[in-house]
UniProtKB/Swiss-Prot annotation:
Superkingdom, taxonomy of origin: Bacteria
Description of how the protein assembles with itself and partners: Homodimer.
MF terms in GO: 2-succinyl-5-enolpyruvyl-6-hydroxy-3-cyclohexene-1-carboxylic-acid synthase activity; magnesium ion binding; manganese ion binding; thiamine pyrophosphate binding
Organism: Serratia proteamaculans (strain 568)
Lineage: Bacteria, Pseudomonadati, Pseudomonadota, Gammaproteobacteria, Enterobacterales
Pfam families linked: TPP_enzyme_C, TPP_enzyme_M_2, TPP_enzyme_N
HAMAP family: MenD (MF_01659)
CDD domains (alphabetical): TPP_PYR_MenD, TPP_SHCHC_synthase
The protein, known as: 2-succinyl-5-enolpyruvyl-6-hydroxy-3-cyclohexene-1-carboxylate synthase
Similarity remark: Belongs to the TPP enzyme family. MenD subfamily.
Enzyme Commission number(s) of this protein: 2.2.1.9
Length: 557
């Protein structure tokens, strides 16, 4: 038996089975043990192959591809710590629902727990974080091809959200051999190879049901909270809410156009709290809320019922309200639950929100820094493009200080909300859509994922990465951290600048010192055609202090 040839036969069937379930993008890291998988992916004309030398970044690249394409994406890595480096992206996918298929090559069983090189215990490596896991046996002709293909089919049919981990042990040799061998093993699947359907098709029994008392509830005083959703869903939800006459509080990721902008500011006002307390029903669409004041209100509100609607499974309400947890996409819900035109019941919230937006504009009119960037960000967005937001302070400033256009695509990693892999994820988002992309991250986030700048060299449309360099993790300036220890143990300033990083990866670079220069640099980036790194060096605590000042100003009104 030629082990190397049959390894490749086995891997080719495995990859073809994934292609039948909509996998188009395959992300590959270098490695020898994963050779059967890599060669099978390269030979399959259904796939677009992406490569990266860092498995942690590779996993996040796949995450970005899955976010923007809304399709399952496969990842191939070798054995050992290469597999462990996928953990952060796997965790994020589990929380935000992107479908990722992690194919981890492994040593065969006889090389585990005996001191063999690059051999770790990969079975169950990711604990409970994958939605599904398959531990494949060592490839052998004793196992029929129909077992392998139906095993993959069954798992992919059940993979509605999160990650599938397929551990793939391969024995040596991994190279060479007569490629014509073992054709009879593959041929047992007959004309399946000439089609494009799965071998085994399972029917999803999940069905969204119309709430029978919706006619009753839609006549009540309701509030809509909009979390993470698609651009189309955000637009339609805003129209639905307007027809109902219900106030809509939109998160930065809601893409609703935030009819009540600056919610993280005006929610600090007692007048707003009092009016919202009159709501009889709160309906939240999507999870992953960003603003502190919104999260506080969400926890403290006491309507008669609280409905949370999201296609993700599980409990998504940390406040544990009385009400209903309904698994549905926003689009499905709106189709089944039509709005009834009604007079708005909380018009004064519109006044409070508009006043908050005016207060922000007035406060920042002659200031240049990360707060002004957040407030005027819509001016920088590329036409027919998309926006990727980092975590920590910058996403909170954008959520609190501006109003993004309705239906404009916004992406972020707001599941576990880590600062790792953000540039890699943005690169994946760009590749999936081939749209002009604006990404905004902080300096520590950029340092954490610095080698992902290599991925931006291959962007298919103009891409601008703005690095807000406030010299450390200034999100901690918003928290009651011990002042004497804040810089050393929390903010951890690194005193770096990014021109050398841009030069290392052959990216265009600019460091504007005022708004006019920033606008010019961004516009040049859209004309440039490749990737541009724009570094915004700002006073360390200016953004945090601006947000605190504006919240205090709202509280006193």
């Amino acid at each position: 038996m030629s082990t190397s040839v049959f390894n490749r036969r086995w891997a080719a069937l495995l990859l073809e089975a994934l292609a039948r379930h909509g996998v188009r993008h395959v992300c590959i890291a270098p490695g020898s043990r994963s050779t059967p998988l890599t060669l099978a992916a390269a030979a399959n004309k259904s796939f677009i192959c992406h490569t990266h030398f860092d498995e942690r970044g590779l996993g996040h690249l796949a995450l970005g591809l899955a976010k923007a394409s809304r399709e399952p994406v496969a990842v191939i890595v070798t054995s050992g710590t290469a597999a462990a480096n996928l953990y952060p992206s796997l965790i994020e996918a589990g929380l935000t629902g992107e479908r990722l298929v992690f194919l981890t090559a492994d040593r065969p069983p006889e090389l585990i727990n005996c001191g063999a090189n690059q051999a770790i215990r990969q079975n169950g490596l990711y604990a409970s974080h994958p939605a599904l896991s398959i531990d494949l046996p060592r490839p052998t002709t004793d196992i029929p091809a129909r077992w392998l293909v139906s095993t993959v089919d069954s798992a992919m049919a059940r993979l509605q959200h999160g990650a599938l981990h397929i551990n793939c042990p391969f024995a040596e040799p991994l190279y060479g051999g007569d490629e014509q061998q073992y054709a009879d093993w593959s041929a047992t699947l007959g004309d399946w190879w000439q089609g494009n359907h799965p071998w085994l098709r399972e029917v999803d029994p999940h069905q969204v049901l119309k709430q029978p008392d919706w006619f009753f509830w839609r006549q009540k005083r309701g509030v809509i909270v909009a979390g993470r959703m698609s651009a189309d869903e955000g637009e339609h939800l805003a129209q639905w809410a307007e027809m109902l006459g219900w106030p809509l509080i939109g998160d930065v990721l809601s893409q609703t156009g935030q009819p009540l902008p600056c919610a993280d500011l005006w929610l600090a006002q007692p007048q707003a709290q009092k009016r919202l307390a009159e709501a009889q029903l709160v309906v939240q669409f999507g999870s992953s809320l960003t603003g502190k004041r919104l999260l506080q209100w969400q926890e403290q509100c006491q309507p008669q019922e609280y409905w949370l609607i999201d296609d993700l499974p599980g409990r998504l309400d940390p406040a544990h309200h009385r009400g209903r947890r309904i698994r549905s996409s926003v689009a499905q819900w709106l189709e089944l639950h039509p709005a009834q035109p009604r007079t708005p019941w909380a018009d004064e919230l519109t006044m409070l929100a508009d006043n908050a937006l005016d207060a922000v504009s007035g406060h920042l009119v002659n200031r240049f820094g990360e707060a002004q960037l957040a407030h005027r960000l819509p001016e920088l967005l590329p036409e027919n493009g998309q926006l990727f937001l980092g975590n920590s302070l910058i996403v909170r400033l954008i959520d609190a200080l501006t109003r993004l256009p309705a239906g404009y695509p916004v992406f972020s990693n707001r599941g576990a909300s880590g600062i790792d892999g953000l540039i890699s994820t943005a690169a994946g988002v760009q590749r999936a859509t081939a749209k002009p992309t604006l990404a905004v991250v902080g300096d520590l986030s950029a340092l954490y994922d610095l080698n992902a700048l290599a991925l931006l060299r291959q962007c298919s449309a103009p891409t601008v990465l703005i690095v807000v360099n406030n010299n450390g993790g200034q999100i901690f300036s918003l928290l009651p951290t011990p002042e004497e220890d804040r810089q050393r143990f929390y903010c951890m300033p690194q005193n770096v600048e990014f021109s050398h990083a841009a030069a290392m990866f052959q990216l265009a670079y600019a460091r504007p010192e005022n708004w006019g220069q920033l606008l010019q640099a961004v516009e040049q980036g859209w004309r440039h055609g490749g990737a541009t790194l724009i570094e915004l060096q700002v006073p360390p605590s200016d953004g945090a202090q601006t947000l605190q000042h504006l919240v205090q100003q709202m509280t006193e009104q």
